[in-house]
């Protein structure tokens, strides 16, 4: 067909640099998934493949539509610009492979997503015990907390099964009180405090010459940097936290300070925030005294 001939010619000329598959139901008027085709004639003659990204699962529900989050957009940009191959997400597909597929550019032909089936262990249901294969699926956690695994689970006489060393309602407490978890928690605090220390001066020195977009760019880049390669933490989740806070709360404050200065905005901090931070005990005493007054008023009325 004509469409196939056009696609073949464009691919063979090397004009397509990348294809990015987006989630369904993003745009009004259509619920089908959309794709971004990156066309770039620069160095087209030397291009021997097309970089493909399947970002169809990175979104959040927003009413009856789906919406890309800040972290979804940032991950797409980072992966594409750096040509990072991630299993089930991105891949550099050679022209030879595309030719073997008759120039079909549908992403599922090249990027395979493995969805694990919910297999039930019948023996475990009938005879009890926790299948070791289920425990082994949490290997990424056991690498960080190697001895917690032995604290939580105990070998049984049946091969392939373990049992809990504590009551189910004690699992959280057992983990939270373990020294390995405490050490990991401290590591996260140290990483976060490192990020905070790096950027305190950026906020303290806000003035009319500051550029708000530059401020959040530096802070968000720093967040990605410090949480890169931290086990069990997705740096893009952390990026989303700072971007959400910026969009919902912090952005307006920064713009006000840049426009009017600190003095003009000295009432930015809510009164209850100051009380909770510096006078919480005094507030508790006031609340107690007010409760006592109410009680006395009720007794007086009763008399």
Where are these regions (language model features)?
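A conserved structural/catalytic subdomain of Rossmann-like adenosyl-cofactor enzymes
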Residues: 1-303
């Amino acid at each position: 067909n004509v469409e196939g001939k056009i696609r073949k010619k464009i691919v063979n000329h090397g004009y397509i640099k990348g294809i990015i598959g987006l989630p369904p139901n993003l745009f009004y008027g259509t619920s089908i998934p959309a794709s971004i085709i990156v066309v770039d004639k620069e160095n087209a003659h030397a291009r021997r493949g097309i970089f493909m990204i399947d970002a169809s699962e990175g979104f959040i529900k927003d009413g009856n539509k789906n919406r890309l989050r800040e972290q979804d957009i940032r991950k797409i940009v980072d992966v594409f610009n750096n040509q990072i191959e991630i299993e089930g997400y991105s891949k550099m597909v050679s022209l030879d492979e595309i030719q073997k597929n008759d120039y079909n550019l549908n992403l599922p032909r090249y990027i395979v997503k493995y969805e694990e089936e919910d297999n039930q262990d019948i023996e475990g249901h009938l005879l009890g015990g926790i299948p070791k294969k289920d425990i082994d699926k949490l290997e990424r956690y056991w690498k960080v907390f190697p001895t917690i695994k032995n604290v939580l689970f105990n070998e049984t006489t049946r091969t392939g099964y373990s049992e809990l060393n504590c009551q189910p309602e004690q699992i959280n407490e057992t983990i939270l009180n373990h020294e390995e978890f405490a050490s990991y928690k401290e590591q996260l605090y140290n990483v976060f405090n490192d990020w905070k220390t790096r950027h305190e001066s950026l906020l303290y020195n806000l003035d009319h010459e500051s550029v708000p977009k530059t401020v959040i760019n530096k802070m968000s880049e720093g967040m990605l940097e410090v949480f890169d390669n931290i086990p069990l933490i997705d740096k893009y989740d952390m990026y989303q936290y700072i971007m959400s806070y910026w969009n919902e709360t912090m952005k307006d404050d920064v713009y006000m300070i840049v426009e009017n200065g600190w003095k003009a905005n000295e009432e930015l901090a809510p009164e209850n925030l100051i009380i909770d931070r510096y006078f919480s005990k005094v507030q508790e005493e006031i609340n107690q005294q007010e409760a006592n007054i109410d009680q006395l008023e009720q007794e007086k009325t009763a008399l």
